[in-house]
């Protein structure tokens, strides 16, 4: 334990670390602890921690020690009675055990920030430990050459220096159930004697024995006694005894009181920075060797010690405070905190829960379930008990309790108002989902006495506890079938607690075990109802169910779901990777909004006694409504191996259900209540109900426009006698429990493939809860149209089904379970995340990704968008937030703390939905007629990342076909200057289709290649970049099609479009904007108009009649079309300079007249006052109504790819008004861009195979010398080919694609693609040749790291 004798100056970062706030309540405010904490929570939570200085003195030292010894003695006696062991010293005083904690740095450890903790094996009385602690402190300071009295900052400096010095150990007695405060009965008596205020802190409501269940704390309604949560724990420490970075269980508040001794330093990080904090720990603490989920679990072991300096440098808000004896420290939900003691001291702590905790309770429960930790509490149970208790209160006019202060009542009313609002919102959400899922059928109520149904067993709890074999601190499970789970005290968790004690809210409990403080939670209604329900106790005594998707304990309503036979067969045999994409794209939040959009008037009732079928959409149908026709084909089942690697591949599936498919499936019934069945199994389409009547139901009814669940249509059972027929494959028909929200999501996913069997269950007191919610809603003036829900009692068959579902929870299914196939099994994903396969990246699960702040791999871009031009040197700085008393700017904080652009996220999701291909059951994608597969997958994804796209666009309709009058001569194709004139041709049939890379036709001699952004026309010599992927390389199935509906649809210049409104919207947004301005700026000379029909089909007539809104939208979309080539990564060509010269000549002739007339023309065009002849209209990608008043002469127009230039700020403006000023500004920007293009094209590389050009001769010379001319790079290459490939480093070009079916990953380099393919194939080619090792590795980096760390031989490397 060598200690450096150098000067112990305070670290600068410690001096600058913000100090957490301290609050000094008045005596009146101090009477209601929860109300006061709720009052300061908004301010203090931005620090994560705060300090409260009581207005009353602490208890005397003698009293505190006496109470502590009494608690320790009682605990020892209880252990002796339970057959354990108790320890007392020879004088008869109680003793306690301690743990050894490492101080110092051990570089040999894999992760040095994880400090070892182990049992010391010593037993001390309070006096003995105090003597040893003070002796250690004296000796340590003497070796440091420091005086005995040090400031807090000096001690902190000593501590952090010791953490990086030679290791030594200290002792700490923590997590000991007990309290040093006087018993509650004695405290109440003394309070009465003193007039209700108390003489010391222990005689007030701040007595730690009662804080968890204080008035206003939600934990008041927990029936279990969990040490450290609902009852306090004691901590006895010595100098440098530390507690590691952690958050409280379920993100609860914690209250900590220091009784006596030296001070204690606390460090805190606010909840807003929690995810960023975890990422810094993962990167800087764990060396990026753990994925985020395992990082969170490892932090939960409470062994990670890291200096706040690391977090401050990484942009994480962090603060500190020093707790002195007699002071309280409050930590707020989700705030990470750690600290250490300055010397010998002892204190105690427990959890509380203010109403603000309810806002984050669900997310905390999901994160806890994601690491397979069993839940300790149901936030919904506490919420319901809390609100119903408020309803049964005695009116204040006859309340014998004195009103202490208006502040107390005001703070309490704020908390009550918040809980009531959350309560009503939750019941409304349930009401909508019950109505949409149940279709009006009675919902089963769980029995009041459910001893015959074992809802939770010890096996289930034990299987959820995690054991970490690497650490001496671990959770031990003696026997999965035993009655208790033994928890090693060294793990920093709670004491040895029986499962039935700790999780009694999950299991059946005695109905007579009620605390007197909770008696008012039982009734809120009349005395008659109270007598009627005298057998039932508070709502907390009812059993709880855990959702398989999110892990949250559903206290009120659950759904038991089983896929139907058809859906199960599909799930077991087909590649279902697109389900994950569907979930990632839609999100669960949309379902609630969708449910609220439903109309309850169309609901029909089902059979009341059995599971009922959900109306499904079969795949064999062809429905025609009016002039609208939609059709789909029956899927072909494709077989695929169901293994872990297949699941990994499914995480990268690139197809999802698009809006187009949803709209096609939306069918209007011919008459109210009358629908037609299209049976997938080949039946006559009718199902017979129990009463013998024939009931038709609509198989086509899909979602509403918001993807909601339809309430219309009838459904009845075919298999009434046995609704769940046993199948040979248990995994395919396994019953699972879902919360209502995720049950609705699963129903929506499986609806097209056969549907589900569904049983809805509610708490036996749910009708009473819903009745109370309606009263509270009126009180809060919340208007809602409640759906009427009928309830029924469960039958014996229902109880057997419930028991089977709960048994399936305990039986851990493999990767063939249908919920695993569907990607909605949270427990399986949590287990999978701990496998070596996912050591650095979590397996995709939408719930887990959202809980840990990760974006969906479907929507996330593989590389960051490049900001080029002059804007790259200037980073816009803005205020991100205020934490720890400081305003944080965007350049100061960790990237995880930067606010996400909600509009950008929505547009990205919309873009993903529109770009994603439709996929049938065979795994093949069906492409729109005018979009090639390659262009959509590559360009669409890139375009989504760089531009915000409107969710809706102007429908594009097929116009009259045109015939080329004057072709392009050979001369014009050389200088790329041409003139085209078109005339209407209604008598000539023309072909618009061609297989391959080019598309041409008699009427369309120019076509935009969506993949490359190059104009293809007759006589035009095509060229392409070396970095681009050819369509032919991906197979002959990829075709480029023009967007004509049919050849015969052109006749007579008028037609009915074969596209409905929504199809055209999709086609527009899927079009790559690849047409240069020279072809888009045409004068329309042949008058055409669109007339909207009620059925959504547009008809053409002979006069322009277009609304201002449509015109403005078209002009805005033209802005997007102009800049597409800028964003495609397509920069230089071999003939850049020639085209630039021609463009400059043309510009001098036309720019002035265009400026004078463009604004006036657009205004007249938008108002419908002016008709112009059509010069051309091409149905290729990105064609828009762009008007030029004066047509330039022959030779003035040209096609020229745009340069990757600066991004104009108006790129995302699709709906702004096109005024004269806007048009003039656009012309000025065009001139600036052309100047840059000319500069860029001034110096062309003439080396063979190189098409790059530069703006200066210096850059060109460096380039020819095989030196990268990019500023700050300057790399040298021995081959010009490698230099050209190196340019990918400085651009967004990712030409290489993963060949695995369903994977959307793209790469810049071949080696990275090769390594990625191993993820799909499971290949592990690197094998350690060391005897008795034989480890295999997928990546060479992992293999090299293994050899460095182990020293194994590198000479015998094998590849297999």
From Swiss-Prot:
Residues 1136-1147 have a biased composition (Basic residues). Zn(2+) 1 binds at residues 1245, 1250, 1263, 1280. Residues 203-369 form the JmjC domain. Induction: Induced by abscisic acid (ABA) during seed germination. Induced by dehydroabietinal-dependent (DA), a diterpenoid tricyclic diterpene that promotes flowering and systemic acquired resistance (SAR). Up-regulated by heat stress (at 30 degrees Celsius) and remains up-regulated transgenerationally in the unstressed progeny (at 22 degrees Celsius), partly via a heritable feedback loop involving HSFA2. Coiled coil: none annotated. InterPro entries: JmjC_dom (IPR003347), JmjN (IPR003349), Znf_C2H2_sf (IPR036236), Znf_C2H2_type (IPR013087). This is Lysine-specific demethylase REF6. It comes from Arabidopsis thaliana. The gene is REF6.
């Amino acid at each position: 334990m060598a200690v450096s004798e150098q000067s112990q100056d305070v670290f600068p970062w410690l001096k600058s670390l913000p100090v957490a706030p301290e609050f000094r309540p008045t005596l009146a405010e101090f009477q209601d602890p929860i109300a006061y904490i709720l009052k300061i929570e908004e301010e203090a939570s931005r620090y994560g921690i705060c300090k409260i200085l009581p207005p009353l003195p602490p208890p005397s030292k003698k009293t505190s020690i006496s109470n502590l010894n009494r608690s320790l003695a009682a605990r020892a006696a209880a252990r002796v009675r339970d057959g354990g062991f108790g320890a007392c010293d020879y004088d008869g005083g109680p003793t306690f055990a301690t743990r050894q904690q490492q101080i110092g740095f051990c570089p040999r450890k894999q992760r040095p920030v994880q400090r070892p903790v182990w049992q010391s094996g010593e037993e001390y009385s309070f006096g003995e430990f105090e003597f040893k602690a003070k002796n250690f402190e004296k000796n340590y300071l003497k070796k440091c050459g420091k005086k005995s009295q040090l400031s807090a900052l000096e001690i902190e400096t000593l501590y952090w220096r010791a953490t990086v010095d030679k290791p030594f150990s200290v002792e700490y007695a923590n997590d000991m159930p007990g309290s040093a405060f006087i018993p509650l009965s004695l405290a109440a008596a003394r309070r009465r004697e003193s007039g209700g205020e108390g003489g010391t802190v222990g005689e007030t409501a701040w007595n730690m024995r009662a804080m968890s269940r204080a008035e206003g704390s939600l934990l008041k309604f927990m029936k279990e006694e969990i040490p450290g949560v609902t009852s306090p724990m004691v901590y006895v420490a010595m100098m440098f005894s530390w507690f590691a970075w952690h958050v409280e269980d379920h993100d609860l508040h914690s209250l900590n009181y220091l009784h006596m001794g030296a001070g204690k330093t606390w460090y805190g990080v606010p909840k807003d920075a929690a995810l960023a904090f975890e990422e810094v720990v993962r990167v800087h603490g764990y060396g990026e060797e753990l994925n985020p989920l395992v990082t969170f679990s490892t932090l939960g072991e409470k062994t990670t010690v890291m200096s706040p300096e690391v977090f401050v440098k990484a942009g994480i808000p962090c603060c500190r405070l020093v707790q002195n004896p007699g002071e309280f420290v409050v930590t707020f939900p989700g705030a990470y905190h750690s600290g250490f003691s300055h010397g010998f001291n002892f204190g105690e702590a427990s959890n509380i829960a203010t109403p603000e905790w309810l806002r984050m309770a669900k997310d905390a429960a999901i994160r806890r379930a994601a690491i397979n930790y069993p839940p300790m509490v149901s936030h919904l149970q506490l919420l319901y008990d809390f609100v119903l208790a408020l309803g049964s209160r005695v009116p204040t006019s006859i309340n014998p309790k004195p009103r202490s202060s208006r502040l107390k009542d005001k703070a309490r009313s704020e908390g009550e108002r918040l809980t009531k609002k959350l309560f009503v919102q939750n019941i409304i959400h349930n009401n909508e989902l019950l109505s949409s899922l149940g279709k009006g059928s009675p919902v089963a109520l769980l029995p009041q006495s459910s001893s015959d149904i074992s809802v939770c067993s010890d096996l289930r709890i034990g299987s959820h506890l995690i054991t970490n074999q690497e650490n001496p601190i671990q959770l031990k499970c003696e026997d999965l079938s035993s009655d208790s789970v033994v928890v090693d005290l060294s793990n920093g968790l709670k004491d040895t607690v029986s499962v039935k004690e700790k999780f009694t809210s999950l299991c059946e409990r005695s109905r007579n075990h009620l605390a007197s403080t909770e008696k008012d939670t039982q009734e809120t209604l009349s005395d008659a109802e109270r007598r009627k329900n005298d057998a039932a106790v508070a709502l907390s005594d009812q059993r709880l169910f855990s959702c398989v998707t999110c892990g949250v304990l559903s206290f009120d309503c659950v759904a038991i779901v089983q896929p139907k036979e058809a859906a199960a067969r599909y799930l077991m045999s087909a590649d279902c990777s697109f389900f994950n994409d569907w979930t990632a794209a839609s999100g669960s939040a949309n379902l609630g909004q969708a449910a609220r959009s439903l109309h309850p008037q169309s609901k029909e009732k089902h059979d009341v006694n059995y599971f009922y079928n959900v109306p499904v959409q079969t795949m064999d149908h062809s429905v025609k409504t009016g002039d609208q026709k939609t059709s789909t084909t029956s899927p072909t089942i494709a077989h695929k191996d169901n293994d872990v690697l297949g699941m990994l591949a499914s995480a990268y599936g690139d197809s999802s259900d698009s809006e187009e498919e949803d709209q096609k499936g939306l069918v209007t019934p011919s008459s109210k209540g009358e629908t037609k069945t299209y049976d997938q199994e080949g039946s006559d389409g009718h199902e017979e109900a129990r009463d013998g009547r024939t009931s038709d139901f609509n198989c086509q009814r899909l979602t509403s426009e918001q993807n909601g669940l339809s309430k219309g249509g009838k459904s009845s059972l075919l298999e009434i006698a046995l609704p769940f027929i046993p199948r040979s494959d248990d995994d395919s028909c396994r019953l699972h429990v879902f919360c209502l929200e995720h049950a609705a999501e699963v129903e929506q996913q499986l609806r097209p493939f056969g549907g589900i069997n569904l049983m809805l269950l509610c708490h036996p007191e749910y009708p009473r809860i819903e009745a109370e919610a309606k009263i509270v809603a009126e009180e809060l003036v919340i208007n809602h149209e409640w759906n009427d829900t009928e309830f029924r009692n469960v039958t014996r068959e229902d109880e057997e089904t419930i028991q089977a579902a709960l048994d399936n929870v305990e039986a851990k299914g493999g990767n063939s379970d249908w919920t695993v196939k569907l990607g909605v099994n949270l427990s399986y994903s949590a287990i999978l995340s701990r496998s070596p396969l996912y050591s650095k990246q979590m397996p995709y699960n939408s719930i887990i990704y959202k809980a840990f702040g990760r974006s969906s791999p479907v929507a996330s871009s593989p590389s960051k968008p490049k900001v080029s031009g002059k804007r790259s040197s200037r980073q816009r700085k803005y205020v991100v937030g205020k934490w720890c008393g400081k305003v944080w700017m965007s350049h100061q904080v960790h990237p995880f703390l930067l606010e996400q652009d909600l509009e950008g996220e929505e547009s990205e999701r919309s873009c993903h939905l529109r770009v994603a291909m439709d996929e049938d059951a065979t795994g093949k994608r069906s492409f729109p007629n005018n979009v090639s597969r390659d262009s959509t997958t590559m360009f669409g994804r890139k375009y989504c990342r760089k531009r915000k796209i409107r969710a809706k666009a102007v429908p594009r309709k097929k116009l009259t076909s045109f015939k080329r009058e004057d072709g392009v001569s050979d001369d014009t194709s050389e200088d790329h200057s041409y003139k085209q004139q078109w005339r209407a041709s209604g008598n000539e049939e023309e072909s618009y289709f061609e297989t391959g890379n080019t598309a041409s036709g008699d009427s369309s001699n120019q076509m935009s290649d969506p993949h490359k952004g190059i104009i293809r026309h007759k006589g035009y010599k095509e060229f392409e970049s070396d970095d681009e992927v050819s369509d032919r390389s991906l197979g002959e199935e990829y075709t480029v099609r023009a967007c004509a509906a049919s050849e015969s649809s052109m006749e007579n210049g008028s037609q009915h479009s074969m596209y409905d409104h929504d199809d055209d919207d999709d086609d527009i947004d899927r079009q790559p904007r690849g047409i240069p301005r020279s072809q888009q700026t045409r004068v329309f000379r042949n008058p055409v108009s669109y007339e909207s029909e009620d059925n959504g089909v547009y008809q053409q007539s002979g006069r322009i009649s277009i609304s201002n809104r449509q015109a403005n939208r078209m002009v805005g979309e033209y802005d997007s079309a102009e800049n597409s080539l800028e964003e495609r990564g397509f920069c230089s060509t071999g003939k850049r300079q020639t085209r630039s010269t021609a463009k400059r000549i043309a510009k001098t002739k036309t720019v002035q007249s265009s400026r004078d007339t463009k604004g006036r023309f657009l205004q007249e065009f938008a108002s419908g006052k002016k008709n112009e002849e059509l010069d051309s209209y091409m149905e290729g990608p990105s064609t828009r109504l762009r008007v030029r008043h004066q047509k330039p002469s022959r030779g003035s127009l040209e096609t020229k790819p745009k340069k990757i230039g600066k991004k104009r700020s108006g790129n995302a403006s699709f709906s702004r008004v096109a005024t004269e000023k806007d048009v003039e500004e656009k012309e000025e920007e065009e001139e600036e861009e052309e100047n840059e293009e000319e500069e860029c094209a001034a110096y062309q590389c003439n080396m063979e195979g190189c098409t790059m050009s530069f703006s200066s001769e210096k850059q060109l010379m460096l380039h020819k010398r095989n030196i990268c001319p990019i500023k700050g790079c300057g790399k040298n290459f021995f081959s010009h080919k490698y230099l050209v490939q190196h340019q990918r480093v400085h651009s967004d070009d990712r030409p290489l694609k993963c060949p695995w079916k369903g994977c959307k990953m793209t790469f810049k380099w071949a080696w990275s693609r090769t390594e990625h393919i191993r993820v799909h194939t499971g290949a592990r080619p690197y094998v350690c040749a060391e005897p008795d090792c034989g480890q295999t590795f997928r990546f060479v980096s992992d293999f090299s790291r293994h050899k460095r760390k182990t020293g194994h031989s590198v000479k015998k490397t094998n590849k297999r």
